[in-house]
């Protein structure tokens, strides 16, 4: 397994307990009153005690990872991510909006932005499964289209001095340029620590067209871009028909397996 790093900078944003947890999940439809009560169906994966352990074994509250899915890629394609991070003591949140052909990247970015504060409210509600389990620290993460939308969300959050958002992580980030917006332009306003990981053989979102311009525009004092040698676009998640079809038509020279690419990715994400 090979990888290139530019530059080598690691930032430990969250202090998560080493205890291992089981994973539970619930779905909830949130409504954004500022956008005509737009409904944002959301999947929430959170730590619960292992079998035979008492609820007191939960060492919360737990930081949030808010994840944006790729174009035509269902949220459950990323089970590899919640299986990796939730047992370590993170809550992962997946909006299911903008999953069809006619996607609006700006709306998806606004969905992610909205959920940053909405999940905090969810943690304050005594009827919520994650009551008293939500830490203020939040990371935005996304793959492909969702990565680009994450930078659109971070733009506004950074400009407005949001105090929850602590880092942003992009996996094979796609430039989101629908409706006059641009993830590359939005990166100029992103001041939080940022990590971008790409596959060197990604022909869907070629790094020199998508990830590198975003990285170069970042105003973050701490930023890292990693290119996984021989890696592809779709290997950050589990198999998905539409993603894999697009990859087969556009990418050449992928020389590592999906498992290998995910292991390299986890090595760096866990350090970050």
Functional labels for PLM-detected ranges:
Residues 63-70, 96, 172, 198-199:
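The conserved beta1-alpha1 loop
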Residues 215-272:
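C-terminal catalytic-base region of ester-bond hydrolases, centering on the histidine
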Residues 162-233:
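The feature captures the conserved acid-bearing segment of alpha/beta-hydrolase catalytic domains
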Residues 55-61, 106-148, 156-160:
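Gly/Ser-rich "nucleophile elbow"/oxyanion-hole loop immediately N-terminal to the catalytic nucleophile
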Residues 73-99:
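Short amphipathic alpha-helix adjacent to the substrate-entry channel of hydrolases
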